[in-house]
């Protein structure tokens, strides 16, 4: 009995099914081979002499498709069959459909004991069918990262030196490191909170920074935020280093806060800015830079607040107020007084603040005003065998180290939880003198904006000028700086007005270069006299001389351009007049030739001369009228061009 004939369509269908099964099992060959059972059973039809005879083939030749290597298509992440978004807390049913656990609970048929698939309506026989995809993914073998990538991740986050103190006591601001931190992709366009730890050396700052740094990643990921055990985060540790001269910052920001209101939190170590070995000028400048690089300060002291701590705090608050007034920023947003190993273990933080205020007795007025307000709070951290006391309430006595660790971690969690509320911000209602009004969230400074403000501050500090040894002298220099900038802007505005007023040709011709030079000189002297009286620094004469030199240079640049423009306008008018005179001479010569021709033809030389004279007079009058009309049209076109808004400034900024 002959075998049934296998058509080409059936052959391709059966071949595709077999090959799909083999491909699923991992066969990556580019050539397809017909199975042996089909190769032997395949019957071909041969026509011989008008009759068909069946002829079987013992073997089927290998079919080469020559597909070559094809790139595997990109696999999209699994999506929920209900919300069509990426799976969140996914579950998988026996039917093969995946859902978010929240979507599945919402669309589950009420009253159905067994789970029913919302897509295919298939009822699962066992509740074991709800298997979490996340748990199954955890069972997959984890591939280690390449060594190069591991090294990159290890060095990506580190503490960077922002402000260095050289051997002579001078400050070196490293703008490259500042830009690397504040212009990080997570902080460039995001409000920033700079959590700065102040204090003397060997006062436990590294211990505090380590716990803050270990708690930030867990809080960022949504965990409880408690510091993890030591060693659980390799590479994320502040560490103790004897070379702490200067200001340091952790290079990687941590995004904290609610969704849509994230704040990039940085950790800052002020190093030895409180060292008495530094000069007064260096300490004042470090206080100014610390104010710019912090929005949440923690003054870490040992045992109790000493007179040196209060003196430094007084200077810091004074400098912060001066900087805040000049740059339009909030001077002190939040300050914690953390007293470690306190001997006043039976008092609360508020009681300790009262003792401090009584001790001050008007010696440090700015510190007293700060402690009386709501911007500062005090925490007493006793030794591990003593109890913990905060500002609001006192805890029961405890003599175990576990109690100390518990309360210390509670303080760390409280600091990290409230840090997003103290992002770097400008003063409410204004930024600073001469700047636009800020409202709402625009008061919060992003990383890029703060980096620009620090660059402006470094430009002022880097100028060779008189030194200052106190916040008052610094305030006087900043006041004089504002006055100098105001004088420059006033003179620039006057020059711009003169530029606009002399745009037209005939308006410029009415003001000679010497006259314009006298006008600029008079205005310069008036500005110097008016703003020079308001200067406060002792080096008033040097400041006025430098300002006069800058104004004189700007006036000279304008006069050079104005003189060239005046000469160009004068040459244009002279060219028009010269063209008119040439036309007049040509008219006279032409009239004379016409008169001579008429005289020769008519034989009346006298009449020809008279005609020539008359023609000359007529032509001359026509040329004069034409010249006047031309000049009038030029002036009219100039008026229309100026009134139409075509006012190109003479001075352009690159």
UniProtKB/Swiss-Prot annotation:
Any transmembrane segments, and where? 570-590, 603-623
Q: By its UniProt entry, which InterPro entries does this protein fall under?
A: G_GB1_RHD3_dom (IPR030386), Guanylate-bd_N (IPR015894), P-loop_NTPase (IPR027417), Znf_C3HC4_RING-type (IPR018957), Znf_RING (IPR001841), Znf_RING/FYVE/PHD (IPR013083)
- Write down the membrane topology: Multi-pass membrane protein; Peripheral membrane protein
A GO term, aspect molecular function: GTP binding
Per UniProt, GTP binds at 340-341
Family recorded in the similarity comment: Belongs to the TRAFAC class dynamin-like GTPase superfamily. GB1/RHD3 GTPase family. GB1 subfamily.
**Can you name this protein?**
RING finger protein 112
Q: Which organism is it from?
A: Mus musculus
Q: What is the lineage of its organism?
A: Eukaryota, Metazoa, Chordata, Craniata, Vertebrata
* Name of the gene encoding the protein in the UniProt record: Rnf112
């Amino acid at each position: 009995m002959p075998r049934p004939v296998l058509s080409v369509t059936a052959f391709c269908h059966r071949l595709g099914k077999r090959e799909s099964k083999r491909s699923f099992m991992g066969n990556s060959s580019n050539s397809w081979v017909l199975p042996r059972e089909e190769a032997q059973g395949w019957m071909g039809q041969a026509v011989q002499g008008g009759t068909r005879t069946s002829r079987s083939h013992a073997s089927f030749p290998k079919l080469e498709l020559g597909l070559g290597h094809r790139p595997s298509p990109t696999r999209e992440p699994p999506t929920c069959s209900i919300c069509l978004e990426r799976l969140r807390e996914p579950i998988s049913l026996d039917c093969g459909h995946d859902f978010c656990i929240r979507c599945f609970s919402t669309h589950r048929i009420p009253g159905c004991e067994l789970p029913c698939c919302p897509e295919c309506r298939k009822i699962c026989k066992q509740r074991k069918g709800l298997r979490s995809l996340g748990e199954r993914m955890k069972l997959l073998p984890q591939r280690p990262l390449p060594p190069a990538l591991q090294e990159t991740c290890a060095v990506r986050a580190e503490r960077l030196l922002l402000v260095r103190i050289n051997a002579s006591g001078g400050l070196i601001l490293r703008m490259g490191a500042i830009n690397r931190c504040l212009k990080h992709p997570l902080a460039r366009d995001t409000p920033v909170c700079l959590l700065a730890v102040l204090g003397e050396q060997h006062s436990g700052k590294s211990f505090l920074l380590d716990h803050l740094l270990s708690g930030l990643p867990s809080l960022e990921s949504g965990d409880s935020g408690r510091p993890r055990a030591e060693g659980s985060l390799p590479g994320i540790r502040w560490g103790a280093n004897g070379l702490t001269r200067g200001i340091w910052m952790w290079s990687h920001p941590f995004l904290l806060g609610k969704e849509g209101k994230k704040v990039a939190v940085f950790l800052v170590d002020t190093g030895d800015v409180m060292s008495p070995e530094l000069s007064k000028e260096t300490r004042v400048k470090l206080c100014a830079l610390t104010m710019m690089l912090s929005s949440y300060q923690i003054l870490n002291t040992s045992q109790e607040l000493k007179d040196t701590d209060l003196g430094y705090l007084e200077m810091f608050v004074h400098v912060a107020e001066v900087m805040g007034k000049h740059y339009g920023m909030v001077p002190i947003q939040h300050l914690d007084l953390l007293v470690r190993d306190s001997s006043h273990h039976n008092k609360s933080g508020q009681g300790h603040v009262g003792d401090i205020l009584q001790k001050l007795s008007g010696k440090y007025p700015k510190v007293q005003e700060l402690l009386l307000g709501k911007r500062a709070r005090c925490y007493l951290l006793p030794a591990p065998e003593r109890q913990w006391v905060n500002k609001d309430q006192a805890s029961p006595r405890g003599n175990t180290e576990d109690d100390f660790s518990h309360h210390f971690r509670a303080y760390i969690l409280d600091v990290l939880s409230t840090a997003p509320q103290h992002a770097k911000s400008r003063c409410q209602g204004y930024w600073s003198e001469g700047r636009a009004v800020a409202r709402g969230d625009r008061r919060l400074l992003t990383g890029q904006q703060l980096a620009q403000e620090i660059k402006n501050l470094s430009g002022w500090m880097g100028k060779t000028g008189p030194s200052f040894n106190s916040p008052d002298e610094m305030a006087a220099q900043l006041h004089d700086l504002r006055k100098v900038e105001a004088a420059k802007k006033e003179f620039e505005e006057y020059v711009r007005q003169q530029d606009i007023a002399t745009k037209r040709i005939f308006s410029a011709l009415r003001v000679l270069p010497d006259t314009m030079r006298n006008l600029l000189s008079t205005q310069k002297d008036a500005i110097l006299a008016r703003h020079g009286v308001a200067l406060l620094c002792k080096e008033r004469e040097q400041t006025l001389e430098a300002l006069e030199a800058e104004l004189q240079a700007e006036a000279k640049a304008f006069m050079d351009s104005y003189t060239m423009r005046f000469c160009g306008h004068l040459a244009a008018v002279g060219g028009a007049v010269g063209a008119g005179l040439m036309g007049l001479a040509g008219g006279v010569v032409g009239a004379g030739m016409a008169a001579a021709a008429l005289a020769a033809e008519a034989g009346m030389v006298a009449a020809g001369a008279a005609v020539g004279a008359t023609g000359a007079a007529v032509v001359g009058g026509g040329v004069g009228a034409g010249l006047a009309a031309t000049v009038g049209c030029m002036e009219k076109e100039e008026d229309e061009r100026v009134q139409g808004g075509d006012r190109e400034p003479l001075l352009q900024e690159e």
